[in-house]
């Protein structure tokens, strides 16, 4: 029953994102903390228009392309305490409330709560953790690749701490 409710939330979120005209090129609803939708990179400006109040993607580019994504975090779940070598990120809370911890080093600071519409920027190498609070949280994110010749991918995650032993 719980698995069905979880999958229903993911499918409902996927259909909502598709109803905005976005093409989902891949998805993963099997992460221990929730799941994600990867949006066609050619739709980065439309994604920014919809979720980031129309920030011009040229202003977001650091080195090369941008990669839009939707994160869905389960209640009472946490992504790993992590950072990236080849990307910065910009996030906007789309649905619900989430907790976020950020730090310039491996020390976890206090969690701050964010609500729908709040925007968060993460620099390359900045430690961060997304936390699901009392309900599902949905976050729109754009990867800002920092290495034009070697764009970031799902392997570009340095996990400092992980609740799931990864």
Predicted regions and their residues:
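Short beta-strand His + acidic residue motifs that chelate non-heme Fe in jelly-roll/DSBH
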Residues: 80-82, 91, 100-102, 121-122, ...
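Short acidic-glycine-tyrosine-enriched beta hairpin
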Residues: 104-125
């Amino acid at each position: 029953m719980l698995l069905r409710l979880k999958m229903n939330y993911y499918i409902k979120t996927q259909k909502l994102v598709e109803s905005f005209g976005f093409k989902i090129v891949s998805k993963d609803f099997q992460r221990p903390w929730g799941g994600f939708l990867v949006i066609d990179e050619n739709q980065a400006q439309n994604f920014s228009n919809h979720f980031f109040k129309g920030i011009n993607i040229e202003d977001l580019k650091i080195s090369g392309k941008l990669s839009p994504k939707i994160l869905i975090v389960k209640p009472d779940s946490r992504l790993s305490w992590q950072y990236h070598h080849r990307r910065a990120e910009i996030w906007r809370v789309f649905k619900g409330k989430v907790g976020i911890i950020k730090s310039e080093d491996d020390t976890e600071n206090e969690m701050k709560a964010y609500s729908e519409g709040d925007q968060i920027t993460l620099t390359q190498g900045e430690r961060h953790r997304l936390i699901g609070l009392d309900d599902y949280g949905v976050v729109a994110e754009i990867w800002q690749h920092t290495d034009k010749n070697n764009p970031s991918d799902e392997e570009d995650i340095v996990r400092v701490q992980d609740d799931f032993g990864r």
